[in-house]
Curated annotation (Swiss-Prot):
Membrane topology label: Multi-pass membrane protein
Source species of the chain: Schizosaccharomyces pombe (strain 972 / ATCC 24843) (Fission yeast)
UniProt record similarity statement: Belongs to the peroxisomal membrane protein PXMP2/4 family.
PANTHER family reported in the protein's UniProt record: PEROXISOMAL MEMBRANE PROTEIN 2, PXMP2 MPV17, VACUOLAR MEMBRANE PROTEIN YOR292C
Keyword Lipid metabolism set for record: no
Keywords tagged on the record: Membrane, Transmembrane, Transmembrane helix
Transmembrane segments annotated in the record for this chain: 2-22, 34-54, 97-117, 131-151, 177-197
Subcellular location as annotated: Membrane
One Pfam assignment: Mpv17_PMP22
Protein name: Uncharacterized protein C4G9.14
Keyword Transmembrane among record annotations: yes
GO cellular component entries: cytoplasm; Golgi apparatus; mitochondrial inner membrane; mitochondrion
Amino acid sequence: MFIAKSIVIGLLICVLFFFFFVSRFNDKYELQPLLTLGLLNASLTALSDLLAQALDSYKLLKFRNKRDVSLEKYGNTILLPASTSKLDVHRTIRYAAYGLCLTPIQFRWFVALSNVIQTENPFIAIVLRVALDQFIFAPLGIVFFFLFMGITECKSYERLKSYFRKHYWPTLKANYILWPAVQLFNFTFVPLVLQVIFANAVSMVWTAYLSLKNSSPNADV
């Protein structure tokens, strides 16, 4: 019950923080665009991690009710943590920091795509932007996420390398299931100034997925 209450309180705080900035977006954006986008993105990534923690806690409690100590997964025995009643605040802060740090990179990338790729046929320009985004930014973005989390969690080089080797390609494949369609819509219908916000709103689901993968009991990190 404590984990549920903690996560609900955390979600409410992040939601209020997010909508506070949304309500003042235009004024804040004109004064400090990158900081405004960064704080919005930080609140969204924090929400994503809280969602992931809630799902993770629910799964562990569900399995613990069926089996007291361990569960069988992919042919291996995985020991469950002694308790799931504690909200990992430091983990949520790490994800908020990740969102804040990613924003200026993401924003400048979208601006560069818009400025560099200009053709007489708008559809071709959009397709080229999506292609560059998915074949350049997406692979590097996943590397940035793994490195950021590994460094902020003080993981050793060997464990980080092992995690890369095990999880990079599956994560990149999962990226290609979701993001090409999202970015096609984003670059077609969303104004440039709002493209980062739209991508980050959709990214709540993606970041929750990454958070679950990064914190899974059998992760080599």
